[in-house]
């Protein structure tokens, strides 16, 4: 994992260093052009510097996101288990995720469905950590349905659902979407740190890895995925009660 972290942080740092060096050279050119009285040429070069600074900012934020993700990884096993209403937690994070995405993209729209087993009652979990997992899975589900909608599938209605069910001495949580599904070629990689199918800057590839650790190591549970290409994906969490 350490090698992976180093590699992931090195990439954006290389960009930061390269664009910084180029910008310094461009500033020297600007000084020369101003000295010659060529203000128009100087302004053109200045625009290149501005673009470089935007790229430096972008890659700096990328490195920052990786570091924050790794700090979450290191904290994932901490916390105190307490009796928690899992149905209320799932419902809360479903709506939280939807409204956060809607705030960023006013055109976003999706149907939300819930099916909660009221016989579950409270279960002993670390609510902040479990909430983080549920939120991550729901965020991914909304992302998946939005991507499918943007691809222009006729008559498509983006839908994300979350359900709970008591099975013997376990509680099962399902987060499902009717997005594009996950290719079998990458299915065995999705829980690996830094693996992501999202464009650069949109995901660190740490969400599912962190979720896996929280459920398996932090709670002694299981997390698995069922998917059908073109039809959608369901993540299934099983927690001991």
Model-inferred region functions:
Residues 86, 181-189, 203:
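Short helix N-cap motif at coil->helix boundaries in the Bergerat
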Residues 150-173:
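Short beta-strand-loop-beta element adjacent to the nucleotide/active-site pocket used for signaling
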Residues 177:
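Acidic ATP/Mg2+-coordinating residue in the GHKL
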Residues 46-53, 80-95, 113:
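A conserved beta-strand-to-alpha-helix junction within the catalytic ATP-binding
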Residues 210-220:
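Conserved glycine-/histidine-rich ATP-lid loop and adjacent helix of the Bergerat-fold HATPase_c
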Residues 187, 207-212:
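Short alpha-helical Gxxx[C/S/T] motif in the catalytic ATP-binding
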Residues 148, 198, 225-229:
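A short beta-strand-to-loop motif within the catalytic HATPase_c
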Residues 3, 8-61, 67, 77-81, ...:
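Histidine phosphotransfer helical core of two-component systems
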């Amino acid at each position: 994992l350490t090698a992976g972290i180093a590699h992931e942080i090195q990439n954006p740092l290389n960009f930061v260093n390269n664009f910084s060096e180029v910008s310094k050279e461009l500033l020297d050119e600007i000084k020369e052009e101003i000295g010659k009285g060529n203000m128009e040429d100087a302004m053109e070069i200045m625009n290149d510097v501005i673009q470089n600074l935007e790229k430096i900012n972008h890659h700096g934020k990328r490195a920052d996101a990786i570091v924050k993700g790794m700090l979450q990884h290191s904290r994932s096993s901490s916390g105190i288990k307490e009796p928690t209403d899992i149905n209320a937690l799932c419902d809360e994070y479903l709506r939280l995720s939807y409204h956060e995405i809607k705030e960023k993209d006013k055109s976003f729209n999706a149907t939300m469905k819930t099916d909660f087993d009221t016989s579950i009652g409270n279960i002993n979990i670390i609510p902040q950590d479990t909430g983080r997992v549920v939120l991550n899975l729901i965020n991914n589900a909304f992302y998946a349905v939005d991507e499918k909608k943007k691809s222009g599938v006729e008559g498509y209605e983006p839908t994300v659902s979350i359900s709970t069910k008591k099975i013997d001495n376990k509680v099962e949580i399902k987060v499902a979407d009717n997005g594009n599904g996950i290719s079998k070629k990458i299915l065995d990689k999705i829980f690996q740190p830094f693996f992501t199918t999202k464009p650069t800057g949109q995901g660190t590839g740490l969400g599912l890895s962190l979720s896996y650790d929280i459920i398996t190591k932090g709670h002694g549970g299981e997390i698995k995925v069922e998917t059908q290409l073109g039809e959608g994906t369901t993540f299934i969490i099983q927690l001991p009660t």
